[in-house]
């Protein structure tokens, strides 16, 4: 057993992720008896469980690029028969269903709470950890590789384009001047010192957008999302529904554009569905979530 798989087994029980917009997603999917659904980002299995509980003969194909998530979902959904639940490990952009068609497809984008809260993953600047940020730890490129090898201009563009960081140039300049960096907290401290004092103690930590940009770059999240959204409408049966939950404007912009641009789809949500106030109060990380739905047209 590989080290990654060993770690997956050890950490799977700790992979507790509260799914967002669950009621709205299940209602929007209009789940049918005997239907087959694709959960393209299974995580801990929260959304898949809700789908499986709808009818006793519903099937789910669950995929995730994070082996820890797959291990967790396998454990959390162990009470469902294997003929109703199939797992696939990998990037949803690389998935090929062959001749299989789905009654519905869902994806819950971005980084999960367990990934953020696991120190060894290196996603959070609040926890001292190696600069990793890989969702799929089988891939080679880490956040440290990017921080320590990109030019100042490349880093500034990355922080601006993927993190929407307005102070990207001065942050990149200080990073290049003081690198190499190998830990999350070291990098966060330099970022904080790179910005004017009024930005250091604001509502948003000055490292937030830089870390978002790094994470997106490490995992090629936006490229993968565009590829997935280009392919997945053809995986739907006629009248099948796709539901995508995004967490920041870069993701939502891509989802909005590609659902509208697909000749196979009819958009069902003129405006994105957002969490109700009670869900936001119970799960603060849900506040930025947006759900968009579209349906496969009749041919």
From Swiss-Prot:
Give one Pfam family, short name only: Methyltransf_5
Source species taxonomy: Bacteria, Bacillati, Cyanobacteriota, Cyanophyceae, Oscillatoriophycideae
Q: Which family does it belong to?
A: Belongs to the methyltransferase superfamily. RsmH family.
EC number(s) on file: 2.1.1.199
Gene Ontology BP terms: rRNA base methylation
InterPro entries listed in its UniProt record: RsmH, SAM-dep_MeTrfase_MraW_recog, SAM-dependent_MTases_sf
Highest rank taxon of the organism: Bacteria
Which parts of this chain are annotated as the region Disordered? 275-299
Position of the signal peptide? none
- List of residues binding S-adenosyl-L-methionine: 45-47, 64, 92, 108, 115
Comp. bias regions, Basic residues: 284-299
Keyword annotations for this protein, in alphabetical order, are:
Cytoplasm, Methyltransferase, rRNA processing, S-adenosyl-L-methionine, Transferase
Q: What does this protein do?
A: Specifically methylates the N4 position of cytidine in position 1402 (C1402) of 16S rRNA.
**Origin species:** Gloeothece citriformis (strain PCC 7424)
Q: Does the keyword S-adenosyl-L-methionine apply?
A: yes
Please give the name of this protein.
Ribosomal RNA small subunit methyltransferase H
Q: Which NCBIfam families match?
A: 16S rRNA (cytosine(1402)-N(4))-methyltransferase RsmH
Compartments (UniProt record): Cytoplasm
Q: Name one GO cellular component term.
A: cytoplasm
């Amino acid at each position: 057993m590989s080290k990654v798989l060993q770690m997956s087994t050890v950490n799977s029980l700790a992979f507790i992720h509260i799914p967002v917009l669950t009621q709205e997603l299940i209602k929007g999917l209009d789940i049918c008896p005997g239907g087959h659904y694709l959960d393209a980002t299974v995580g801990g299995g929260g959304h898949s469980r809700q789908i499986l509980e709808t009818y006793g003969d519903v099937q789910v194909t669950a995929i995730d690029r994070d082996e820890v998530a797959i291990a967790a979902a396998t454990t959390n959904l162990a009470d469902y028969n294997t003929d109703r639940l199939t797992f696939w490990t990998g990037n949803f952009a690389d998935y090929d269903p062959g001749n299989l068609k789905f009654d519905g497809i869902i994806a819950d984008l971005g980084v999960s709470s367990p990934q953020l809260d696991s120190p060894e993953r290196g996603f959070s600047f609040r926890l001292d950890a190696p600069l990793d940020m890989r969702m799929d730890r089988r891939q080679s490129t880490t956040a440290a590789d990017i921080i320590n090898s990109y030019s100042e201009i490349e880093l500034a563009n990355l922080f601006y384009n993927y993190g929407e960081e307005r102070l990207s140039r001065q942050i990149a300049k200080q990073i290049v001047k003081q690198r190499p960096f190998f830990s999350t907290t070291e990098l966060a401290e330099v970022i904080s010192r790179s910005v004017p004092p009024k930005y250091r103690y604001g509502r948003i930590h000055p490292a937030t957008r830089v870390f978002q940009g790094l994470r997106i770059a490490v995992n090629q999240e936006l490229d993968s999302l565009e590829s997935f959204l280009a392919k997945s409408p053809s995986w739907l049966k006629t009248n099948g529904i796709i539901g995508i939950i995004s967490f920041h404007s870069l993701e939502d912009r891509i989802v909005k554009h590609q659902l509208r641009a697909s000749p196979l789809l009819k958009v069902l949500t003129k405006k994105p569905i957002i969490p109700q106030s009670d869900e936001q109060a119970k799960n603060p990380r849900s506040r930025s979530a947006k759900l968009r739905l579209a349906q496969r047209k009749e041919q």
